[in-house]
């Protein structure tokens, strides 16, 4: 029987609901024999619903190591057919946590810092997130990465008064991205800016 474990979290793969309930019962007995017990809220049987498994079940998603596993719409690379597969992507909780972290940077207030210094500061962190959470369904991170561009936009408009109009800022941003396409790690995936008037 396959399983993954990290610290006190584990995912056990079962073929049928009956098998899952038997494993649950056996684990409960084992844990109790050493004075422990399974977490009542976190211990669940999850139905990995997809195009081939279409039954109705109470729980069809779970979170593990910052990823949410759930049914997702997919497209066949062979013939373009749309189907449902059970796949991981960055979890909403992890996204919220990273967004909070970026807000705490208060990047737009660091106007004594230049672009190169900003990039040197945030790139190792953002690249780490991209490498870890972007392994599967990385598009789920795009709106979050665009938010980093929003903070960069605010930083530039505060630092350079001439960039406070949309037209001038757009020319500056597009020129910067054309000259230095790899300046910020997340530009490998998302280069557009968001303008807030």
Regions found by a protein language model. Give the residues of each.
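Non-catalytic terminal/accessory segments
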Residues: 1-197
């Amino acid at each position: 029987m396959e399983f993954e474990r990290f610290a006190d979290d584990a995912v056990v793969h079962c073929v049928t609901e009956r098998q899952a309930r038997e494993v649950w019962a056996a684990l409960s007995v084992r844990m109790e024999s050493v004075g422990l017990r399974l977490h009542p809220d976190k211990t669940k049987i999850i139905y990995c619903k997809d195009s081939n498994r279409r039954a109705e079940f109470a729980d069809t998603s779970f979170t593990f190591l910052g990823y949410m596993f759930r049914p997702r719409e997919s497209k066949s690379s062979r013939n373009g057919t749309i189907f449902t597969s059970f796949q991981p992507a960055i979890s909403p909780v992890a996204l919220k946590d990273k967004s909070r972290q970026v807000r705490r940077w208060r990047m737009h207030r660091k106007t004594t810092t230049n672009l190169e210094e900003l990039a040197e500061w945030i790139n190792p962190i953002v690249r780490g997130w991209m490498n870890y959470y972007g392994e599967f369904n990385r598009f789920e991170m795009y709106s979050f990465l665009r938010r980093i561009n929003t903070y960069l936009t605010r930083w530039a408009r505060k630092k350079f008064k001439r960039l406070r109009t949309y037209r001038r800022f757009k020319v500056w941003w597009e020129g910067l991205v054309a000259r230095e396409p790899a300046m910020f790690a997340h530009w490998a995936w998302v280069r557009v800016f968001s303008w807030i008037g």
